[in-house]
UniProtKB/Swiss-Prot annotation:
It comes from Thermoanaerobacter pseudethanolicus (strain ATCC 33223 / 39E) (Clostridium thermohydrosulfuricum). This is Amylopullulanase. The active site is at D628 (nucleophile), E657 (proton donor). Ca(2+) 1 binds at D245, N247, D285, D340. PROSITE patterns: CBM20, FN3. Residues 1452-1474 have a biased composition (Pro residues). Monomer. Its EC number is 3.2.1.1, 3.2.1.41. Gene3D superfamilies: Glycosidases (3.20.20.80), Golgi alpha-mannosidase II (2.60.40.1180), Immunoglobulins (2.60.40.10). Its cofactor is Ca(2+). The keyword Calcium applies. Residues 1-31 form the signal peptide.
Length: 1481
């Protein structure tokens, strides 16, 4: 224990300190590199009291001062008047994220006028003020002092004046903390306040108390805490576990599909290959681990146990492993089931199911995906890394004006619209009500004259551009310009040419080394086709199906069975379009429509084969197919399609049009490529860097790490030949032009500025750099390279702007395409992520040791591709495991040169630009061959390694781990001998070694074969095992066995010998004359094998260590037991010896019955229902004269046994779910009641056959409280209503809740969203942002049901909602103000009558507005605080009428009552005559 220095010493020190340093204050200034992470200012209704305006986020008067370490302060310049206030902190003068705190405002109460200091910490988002919190002064901040200081680099041990382990209160809760990386070891420490011992606290928070011990078992990060109120001191260090604790540490669980240590090999695997899956847990945390996987092909779920394979080198983690292999192609979905005592955890994929690091949950959540593909799957070598060019034929080039106007009609008898001006915009009937519209209002009937001859004329242009594959949109006869509505599959459309033109184009392309892919549309035809003939235009040919139906007999048409026409003449049209009648399915497949299958697939000249080999001339045929709406045609059809084209051109491309994960269609029996829209969307999300709806998908900004995760997700799911042949597009005929996505549209006055174009072009160039450097087949949509712009269909199909091209952009594309073509490494080199942080993404490609990723021979080459979407910066890229030091690179774009030094390469990247670094030719990048005969010999305190010399090796590197397959650490380098002795080992631990060979240039070979070693003390003897006496059976009466072990140098020290393993073995010998029938179960074979349990150290016995273990015998009769010990992880065992000290000795004892010999009463086991992937058992309770101990569950594959015990449950449990079953397999079960004396009574036997049963999936959703009464729907990839927002209407179950039950097959990978009947009313995120599709895997959670509980945050059509008052509300004259109450999205800028304020965390806001008499108009405006988004910007006007006050009439005064006077009599006058008059009243 540390002893305090004497007072005299301290006084002497202080005198010297004062004399030397005098008046120098002790300062704890922030580091120079600690710059403010943001501008923070306090805003609230106090601002007007200091000469500002309330809630002014743009104020420069309340900007907080940055103090370092994330801390900010602001003190009011004057005293605030007494009263109540509200405030919060705004960042960067914006309400983005809703301010800090995000939930509501903070209150401030002042009893008297006061100056107030506000405190904020950026790192913890904590806010407070001086009325609630008083910090410890800087000079008195607590600090850690002790033997730990030097270990963590915090000054000299036990010297507070040198301690840099300063603790800070990051959350303003009077708890100060400090975090450090602490090496393994034993330490003692205390906490002092300030740089002296004047005030210090030790164990239990006692002032001047004892030192605090800290025993750290492995290198780890530890946070130290000090409570300034209680003075308690603690850490967050969790010492290693020693056994089950009914708890699983979720934060320590890990499975990373992108890390070969956790999943090897990476990515999709071939049939017959073995994949190794591993999961990490806190050491000693798990009692068992299993993997549960669903097989998409067999439709079964299987559980396989995992085995513990070792621990991490620092002892912090343990690892469990399972190996799987499949001899058939399939797609596997897996998760882990982890148990520790009574606790069960599940570990599956992350919420987005992108692979990589997963997530632990209490219930089954998301599955990881594993693709198993046919080992024979391949693509043509010319396809891997080729550059594709997609052409929409009518819009590319007019090479033959004579065929421009050969059509009289388009669809039916609609007219054809021919353009005279090549540079016209396509007719867009959406614009028919706009001024200047000149079209005819008919969709897809306008033509420009582009044709096959035009493509032929431009082949040299394409060759010069670097194109090696052309993909043609449909060219067969059709009434429309897009030609996805085929009229005749056997003919080239007359506006495009004829068969001879086609053959010439194919031959000319092939002569230039260019392959051609055709577009096949086999889900539907045109209603105006020779096959359907809705309009009766082809009556001179064979009768069309529709005309035959009209004649009352559809079978009269040779095409009659292709379509299903209902009695009323209706039929299924693709996505509801009656112009596109769908080919029907029989028994789930179009292939079962024989005449259709023969026409497309089976006949010698079937369409699938003919156009690859027209008239027997392969050179005059195309080279493969792109296949439209591939997922809307039965897979069986495509399997036969593949077999057919393989007879003409083996492995010819079959490119599927699929917009999501296509892995299930890429297993090897059909498609071998896909239109990679996943790639497109990820690249756009990264580069565009803002939310944008392109008509197909809403893009949301992501950083480089998320980009890498999404790209790696594709890489790991697709078979390797497919991944290197995917059609990596940025745009197509179905998407908005990429230049317009990036912000430029020449025909839109809001997007056609030079500034917009410059920015869009920079973004496009950046995307092209990524596209041309990445594995796959990059695809250019015609004209993109020339600056073509255009919005949604049909605007994305403008004519190629010949003569008006963007020459600079064309030259750039030519350059970047040819960089790819000239460097094989960019085509078939391997792929490794090198840097993914913020705005910068970098990946590497390699051909080393003379082999590419497919094992083909090519010269060595290395490439590094870097893209930067942000500001200019210097990027340090770690190349330690990628390429050796000294390799020189040249940027093929800029010409700059770079060299790898000290394991990194530093690349300067300008804003919105990139680099393609190619290693200079002539450098030696071929490493020596790997060592194959490494050997290890274990000794006491050392491991001896040896191997044979390798050609060209000048030295060797030694690597060490504790588990096979990874976690290697280099422990020695530049070893020049072919032997090595490792003495830095701990006896009793397992080590794994591998060695690499290094040549004179520094090229390092692959790892050698792995060898295990177990250095250990030698065990000399084990014995002194006690004799167990006759034992009475009982659940609470265990047998205790003791034994001793001696190992020189290990057990002769005080305490337990390190890493010694001790185990007790026991087994049942026989009844020994006892009546054991009460303990037995009929049909269960008595286990007479040894059972081994761990023993624990209980103390020293001289030079020996003493161990003890317990077990509970459950049968009367004779039992045998023995103890064994191992000092080398169980590689060798020493058993307890007899009296001679040499012979292994097992001892026996007798177990006799207790006084309770009465078995439990019988129990009834119910017949289980049929469930998928599980059997649920239920039984009646059993009783006993003493007590029931529990129930044992037994299982067999035969009714007569043998039965095997699979579980034991407590006496209060009357059910059990067995998930270790296979659908379709028969199982038998019995349940046995066991009492406290192990008397047993068995139930009846039941038979169960789990099988695939549709699962009732119950979707419950909670919607915002302002949701209108128009209902809620669930839309997704349901087969019966594919992404239909008005289908699947839910039932209202509460004020804000809806529910629906759908029947789905187990294993279904469902994606869905909630809407209110329309995509205009789809759900949104809490910030109003677009959210990703929700995803679930359908599983049986019990009783063939699954419950999904979701919450909708917001709706697209309601960015703001006003609860009250309603528009045109009338209030009485006495109401002089009214409260506006509403709800809006987080981070919104809300103003009411141009006055801004902040909404609460849940989006609710209230604002009181004054009312004048009469009509009051309140203007409410909301908009996002970041980029403008029209969808999130809305204005609402609320009219409130305040009644005028009622004007009361003045009352008529009442005279006082007086007696009326009596008039004197008067004579009656005689009036003079008067004219008539109207008396005015």
């Amino acid at each position: 224990m540390f002893k305090r220095r004497t007072l005299g010493f301290l006084l002497s020190f202080l005198l010297i300190y004062t004399a030397v340093f005098g008046s120098m204050p002790v300062q704890f200034a922030k580091a120079e590199t600690d710059t403010a992470p943001a501008i923070a200012n306090v805003v609230g209704d106090f601002q007007s009291k200091i000469g500002d305006s309330d809630w002014n986020i743009n104020s420069d008067k309340t900007v907080m001062t940055y103090k370092g370490n994330g801390f900010y302060e602001f003190t009011t310049p004057v005293a605030l008047p007494a009263g109540d206030y509200e405030y919060k902190v705004a960042l960067n003068h914006s309400w983005e994220g809703g301010g800090v705190p995000s939930q509501g405002n903070l209150s401030l109460h002042l009893d008297s006028d006061s100056v107030v200091t506000f405190y904020y910490n950026y790192n913890t988002s904590s806010v407070t003020d001086s009325t609630k919190y008083t910090p410890i002064p800087e000079e008195k901040l607590p600090r850690i002092v002790g033997t730990i200081q030097s270990a963590i680099g915090a000054g000299d041990d036990w010297k507070p004046e040198t301690s840099t382990a300063i603790m800070r209160d990051y959350k303003f809760n009077n708890v100060y903390e400090y975090t450090a990386n602490v090496p393994k070891g034993y330490y003692e420490f205390k906490v002092t306040l300030g740089p002296s011992w004047d005030i210090n606290y030790g164990l239990n928070g006692e002032q001047n108390g004892p030192n605090i011990p800290l025993n750290v078992a492995y290198d780890t990060k530890i946070t130290f805490y000090y409570d300034s109120v209680s003075h308690n001191i603690w850490t967050d260090y969790n010492p290693p576990l020693t056994g089950p604790d009914n708890n699983i540490y979720y934060d320590d669980l890990k499975h990373d599909t992108h890390d070969p240590f956790f999943r090897s090999p990476f990515g999709a695997i071939k049939t017959g290959d073995t994949v190794t899956l591993r999961i990490q847990a806190k050491n000693h945390d798990l009692e068992s681990a299993k993997i549960s996987y669903w097989d998409d092909i067999k439709k079964t779920r299987t559980e396989v146990p995992m085995y513990k394979i070792g621990q991490s080198p620092d002892g912090q983690y343990e690892y469990w492993e399972v190996k799987l292999s499949f001899d058939y192609p399939t797609r596997i979905w897996y998760y882990f089931i982890l148990k520790d005592g009574t606790k069960t955890a599940y570990y599956g994929d992350n919420d987005e199911q992108l692979g990589g690091v997963g997530k632990a949950t209490d219930t089954v959540n998301k599955d990881f995906e594993l693709t198993v593909y046919d080992k024979n799957l391949d693509t043509p070598d010319w396809m891997k890394g080729a550059v594709m060019y997609q052409i929409f034929p009518d819009r590319f080039y007019n090479g033959d004006p004579l065929n421009d106007r050969l059509k009289e009609y388009s669809r039916g008898f609609d007219p054809v619209e021919y353009h005279d001006d090549w540079y016209d915009l396509p007719d867009n009937p959406n614009d028919k009500d706009k001024p200047g519209y000149t079209g005819d209002g008919i969709w897809n009937n306008d033509f420009f004259g582009g044709d096959l001859q035009g493509i032929n004329d431009k082949l040299d242009y394409l060759k010069n551009l670097g194109i090696s594959v052309i993909y043609l949109n449909p060219i067969f006869q059709s009434p429309s310009n897009h030609r996805y509505d085929t009229t005749d599959y056997t003919k080239i459309d007359e506006l495009l040419g004829d068969l001879d033109t086609f053959k010439t184009l194919m031959k000319e392309a092939h002569a230039r080394g260019i392959k051609v892919i055709l577009d096949g549309v086999f889900n539907h035809t045109s209603d105006d086709s020779i096959y359907f003939d809705r309009y009766g235009k082809y009556l001179d040919n064979e009768l069309g199906a529709y005309q035959a139906w009209k004649q009352g007999d559809q079978s009269k048409s040779p095409y009659g069975d292709w379509y299903e026409i209902k009695p009323d003449g209706t039929y299924e049209g693709w996505w509801g379009f009656d112009s596109l009648p769908v080919i029907r399915q029989i028994n789930g497949s179009e292939y079962n429509v024989k005449s259709w299958a023969d026409f497309i697939i089976n006949n010698p000249n079937a369409i699938s084969k003919y156009w690859l080999n027209p008239d027997g001339d392969k050179d005059a045929g195309a080279d493969g197919w792109r296949l439209d709406v591939a997922n809307e045609i039965a897979h069986d059809f495509w399997v036969h399609f593949r077999a057919a084209i393989n007879t003409v051109k083996p492995n010819a491309p079959m490119i599927a049009e699929l917009w999501g994960d296509a892995s299930l269609d890429l297993l090897g029996d059909s498609f071998n490529s896909v239109m990679n829209y996943l790639f497109r969307n990820a690249v756009i999300d990264f580069i565009l860097d803002k939310q944008f709806d392109d008509g197909n998908v809403v893009h949301n900004p992501i950083d480089a790490a998320k980009l890498d995760q999404r790209l790696m997700s594709i890489y790991e799911r697709y078979p390797l030949p497919v991944f290197y042949s995917t059609m990596n597009l940025l745009g197509s005929h179905d998407t908005m032009r990429i230049l317009t996505v990036f912000g430029y549209n020449s025909a839109n006055e809001n997007q056609n500025s030079q500034e917009a174009k410059d920015l869009a072009v920079k973004r496009l160039k950046l995307a092209a750099i990524l596209q041309m450097g990445y594995p796959g087949m990059p695809s250019i949509y015609y004209g993109d390279e020339a600056g073509q712009s255009g919005g949604k269909d049909p605007d994305n199909r403008r004519t190629f702007s010949w003569g008006r091209e963007d020459k600079d952009l064309q030259d750039f594309f030519k350059k970047v395409v040819n960089i790819r073509n000239e460097n094989q490494v960019l085509k078939t080199g391997d792929l490794e992520t090198l840097y993914a942080n913020g705005d910068v993404y970098a990946f590497g490609r390699r051909i080393i040791n003379g082999k590419d990723v497919f094992g083909n021979s090519y010269p060595d080459s290395v490439a590094i591709v870097v893209i930067n979407k942000g500001e200019a910066k210097s990027v340090q890229i770690d190349t330690t495991k990628f390429v050796r030091d000294g390799v020189a690179f040249t940027d093929a774009l800029s010409g700059k040169t770079y060299t790898v030094r000290d394991g990194q390469i530093v690349v300067e990247v300008v804003a919105l630009d990139g680099a393609i670094l190619i290693s200079d030719p002539g450098q030696n990048l071929t490493a020596p061959q790997p060592i194959t005969d490494l050997k290890a010999v274990s000794g006491n305190g050392q491991v001896d390694l040896s191997w044979s010399a390798v050609d060209r090796a000048v030295s060797y590197n030694i690597y060490r781990s504790t588990v096979k397959g990874g976690l290697y650490e280099k422990i020695a380098s530049n070893v020049t001998q072919i032997t090595y002795i490792d003495t830095d080992v701990t006896n009793g631990l397992k080590y794994v070694y591998s060695v690499t060979a290094v040549d004179s240039d520094g090229n390092e070979s692959a790892l050698s074969n792995e060898v295990e070693a177990y250095p250990a003390f030698s065990i000399g003897w084990a014995g002194n095992m006690n004799q167990v006496d006759t034992h009475v059976i009982g659940v609470n009466n265990p047998v205790e066995v003791y034994a001793e072990i001696w190992a020189e140098g290990l057990t002769d020290k005080p305490g337990q010998g390190e890493n010694m393993i001790a185990q007790l073995g026991y087994r049942y010998i026989g009844d020994g004359g006892q009546d054991a029938t009460r303990n037995k179960v009929e049909g269960v074979e008595i286990n007479k094998d040894w059972t081994w349990v761990d023993a624990r150290y209980v103390g020293d016995s001289g030079n020996n260590d003493k161990y003890m273990a317990k077990f509970v015998p459950d049968m009367v009769g004779t039992w045998e037991y023995i103890m064994r010990f191992s000092s080398n992880q169980g590689q060798d065992w020493t058993y307890t010896k007899g009296p001679d000290g040499k012979t292994d000795e097992a001892k026996q004892f007798i177990v006799v019955p207790s006084n309770d010999v009465e078995p439990p009463t019988a129990l009834g086991l119910q017949q289980p229902g049929i469930e998928s992937s599980r059997v649920t058992l239920n039984w009646s309770l059993s009783t006993d004269n003493v007590a029931i101990y529990g129930y044992e569950i037994y299982k067999s594959l035969s009714e007569t046994g043998p039965f095997v015990k699979i579980a034991t449950v407590a006496d209060t449990v009357y059910n059990y779910v067995d998930t270790d079953v296979v659908n379709g397999k028969v199982y038998y079960y019995k349940v046995v009641a066991v009492d406290t004396s192990f008397n047993r009574t068995a139930s009846n036997i039941v038979k169960a056959t789990p099988d695939i049963i549709p699962i009732k999936v119950i979707f419950n959703v909670t919607v915002p409280d302002y949701t209108p009464d128009d209902g809620a729907n669930i839309a997704g990839n349901f087969h019966d209503a594919f992404w239909n927002p008005s289908a699947h209407q839910m039932t209202k179950t509460g004020p804000n809740t809806y529910s629906i039950t759908l029947t789905l097959n187990e294993g279904t990978q469902l994606e869905y969203k909630y809407a209110r009947g329309s995509w205009d009313k789809v759900e949104k995120g809490e910030y109003g942002e677009e959210i990703a599709n929700r995803k679930i895997t359908v599983v049986n959670q019990g009783s063939n049901t699954m419950v999904v509980n979701d919450t909708v945050q917001r709706w697209r059509d309601l960015p703001i909602y006003i609860y009250s008052p309603k528009d045109n509300t009338t209030v009485d004259a006495n109401t002089n103000e009214i409260e506006i109450k509403g709800n809006t999205y987080k981070g919104a800028k809300v103003t009411i009558n141009d006055e801004s304020f902040v909404q609460q965390e849940n989006g609710v806001f209230t604002k009181v507005v004054p009312l004048e008499y009469g009509v009051n108009t309140t203007k409410i405006h909301v908009e996002p605080s970041g980029d403008k988004n029209n969808e999130l910007t809305k204005d609402i006007t609320i009219t409130v009428i305040r009644e005028e006050p009622v004007q009361e009439k003045e009352p008529t005064p009442t005279p006082e009552s007086e007696p009326a006077p009596m008039p004197e009599p008067q004579p009656t006058p005689t009036p003079e005559p008067q004219p008539s008059a109207i008396m005015a009243l």
